C-alpha cells in the first residue's frame, strides 16, 4: 500500500510547481497535507520569482507546517536566482520532513549545479538504501540517478568504482538515460582500456550519436595509432557539432562536455600532422 501511495504522489509531481496528487494524501488519511495540497491546487498560478508565488506556499505551510512540497516549490525560485544558501535551507527542511520524496531532487541538484559530489553520493545512496538501485532519473530526464552517482565517484577520483557502477547498471534491466555508454567509454579511455572504450563509443553511436562521442572516439583511434579512423571520427565530430547535435544543458556544464572550439582545435591538429 505504501508503494502505491508513493507512486501516486510522485507520478503527478512537478519540478516547477511541486504539485502532488492530493488524493494520495487523503488515502493516507493525512488531512493536514490534503488540505494544504487542495489549497495549492485551487490557488491562482504565479511565476516563481513573484512574491505572490511565495505567499501562496507560505499560506499552505500555515495550513500544514509539515507540507514538504511547499518547501521544495519555494526552493526552486532560489535555485534559479542563484541563492543557493536559501535553496539548501529549504530543501534540507523538505528532506527532513519526507526523505523519500526529496532526496532525489536534492541529490541531483548537488551533482548538477553545485558539484557537491560527495553530498550527491550521500543523498542518492541514502535513497537507494530504501528504494533500491533503481531510484529514478535526475530532473533533466537525461540521467538515471545511478549513472549520476557513478559520475560523482569519477569526479572525486574513484574511476574504478564509477566503472563498476555503470557496468552493473548496464547488466540490469534498468533504463540508462542518454549518455551512459559515452561516459563509460571515457572512463575506459582514461584508464587506458582502449578496446573497451571503442566498444562503448560504438554502442553509444547505435543508441544516440552526437559530436562529443565522435570526438572521444577520435582520441581512442589516436591512442591505437589508427590515423585514418582518427581523421574520420574527428571530421564527423566537427560536422555533427555544426549540425547542432551535441550535449546540451541550458542550466549547467555537463560532466565530459566538449565545446566546439575543442573539436576545431583537435581537427586542426589531426589534419596538420
Q: Positions of the model-derived regions?
A:
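N-terminal leader/linker segments that initiate helical-solenoid repeat arrays
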Residues: 19-72, 81, 89, 264-272
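TPR alpha-solenoid repeat register
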Residues: 70, 102-104, 137, 145, ...
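Flexible helix-coil transition and linker loops at the boundaries of alpha-helical arrays
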Residues: 24-28, 58-62, 92-97, 128-142, ...
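Structural motif corresponding to the intra-repeat A-B loop/turn of tetratricopeptide repeats
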Residues: 47, 81, 113-114, 156, ...
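Terminal, low-structured helical/coil segments at or just beyond the last alpha-helical repeat
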Residues: 20-23, 30-31, 160, 164, ...
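TPR/TPR-like (Sel1-like) alpha-helical repeat modules
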Residues: 95-99, 111, 122-130, 205-209, ...
Amino acid at each position: 500500500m505504501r508503494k502505491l501511495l508513493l507512486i501516486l504522489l510522485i507520478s503527478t509531481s512537478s519540478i516547477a510547481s511541486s504539485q502532488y496528487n492530493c488524493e494520495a494524501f487523503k488515502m493516507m488519511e493525512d488531512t493536514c497535507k490534503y488540505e494544504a495540497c487542495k489549497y495549492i491546487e485551487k490557488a491562482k498560478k504565479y511565476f516563481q520569482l513573484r512574491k505572490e508565488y511565495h505567499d501562496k506556499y507560505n499560506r499552505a505551510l500555515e495550513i500544514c507546517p509539515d507540507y514538504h512540497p511547499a518547501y521544495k516549490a519555494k526552493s526552486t525560485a532560489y535555485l534559479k536566482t542563484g541563492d543557493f544558501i536559501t535553496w539548501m535551507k529549504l530543501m534540507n527542511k523538505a528532506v527532513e520532513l519526507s526523505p523519500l520524496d526529496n532526496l532525489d531532487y536534492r541529490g541531483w541538484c548537488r551533482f548538477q549545479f553545485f558539484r557537491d559530489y560527495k553530498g550527491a553520493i550521500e543523498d542518492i545512496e541514502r535513497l537507494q538504501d530504501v528504494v533500491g538501485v533503481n531510484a529514478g532519473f535526475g530532473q533533466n530526464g537525461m540521467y538515471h540517478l545511478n549513472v549520476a552517482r557513478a559520475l560523482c565517484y569519477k569526479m572525486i577520483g574513484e574511476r574504478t568504482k564509477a566503472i563498476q557502477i555503470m557496468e552493473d547498471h548496464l547488466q540490469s534491466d534498468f533504463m540508462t538515460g542518454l549518455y551512459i555508454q559515452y561516459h563509460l567509454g571515457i572512463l575506459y579511455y582514461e584508464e587506458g582500456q582502449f578496446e573497451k572504450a571503442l566498444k562503448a563509443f560504438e554502442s553509444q553511436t547505435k543508441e544516440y550519436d552526437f559530436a562529443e562521442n565522435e570526438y572521444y572516439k577520435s582520441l581512442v583511434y589516436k591512442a591505437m595509432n589508427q590515423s585514418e579512423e582518427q581523421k574520420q571520427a574527428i571530421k564527423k565530430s566537427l560536422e555533427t557539432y555544426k549540425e547542432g547535435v551535441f550535449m546540451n544543458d541550458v542550466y549547467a556544464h555537463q560532466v565530459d562536455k566538449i565545446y566546439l572550439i575543442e573539436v576545431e582545435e583537435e581537427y586542426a591538429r589531426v589534419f596538420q600532422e
